[in-house]
Design a protein with these regions (language model features):
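Non-transmembrane, aqueous-exposed alpha-helical and coiled segments at domain scale
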Residues: 2-122
Length: 122
């Protein structure tokens, strides 16, 4: 799986950041890339759990042992944060969702410290 290319432009997320400034614009860009990769691979809709798996894998591919530091620097510290980003993107009409999609789909997905630091601890 190739790491997504990051195309960073602050103004792309200005409307979202005015409503919720918790996350760096690069976090939104990365999540959009994850959604794009996951949707293309699945050839359609991706569940919250599937999206979290893709998020973890692509973050590790892109940032390796720095993934945890990069994500937390962007304000993304939990799976619930990923869900908040996804639903902020939905509310800003950047992505679509199904009736069954919910922020609850992202609760308790995995432990960020364990998944992003664990593979690199001696």
């Amino acid at each position: 799986m190739d790491a997504p290319e990051i195309h960073y432009e602050t103004e792309d997320f200005g409307d979202i950041l005015k409503k919720d400034a918790r996350f760096d614009p690069r976090a939104y860009d990365f999540v959009l890339q994850v959604i794009s990769e996951a949707s293309a691979s699945a050839k359609g809709h991706v569940t919250g759990a599937e999206l979290l798996d893709w998020f973890r894998d692509l973050a590790l591919d892109a940032y390796g042992p720095m993934a945890y530091a990069v994500l937390t620097d962007w304000g993304v510290k939990t799976c619930e944060d990923v869900g908040d980003i996804v639903f902020n993107l939905y509310n800003a009409k950047r992505i679509a969702k199904t009736d069954s999609d919910s922020p609850a789909d992202f609760i308790g997905g995995f432990d960020f410290r364990q998944e992003f630091l664990g593979p690199f601890e001696a």
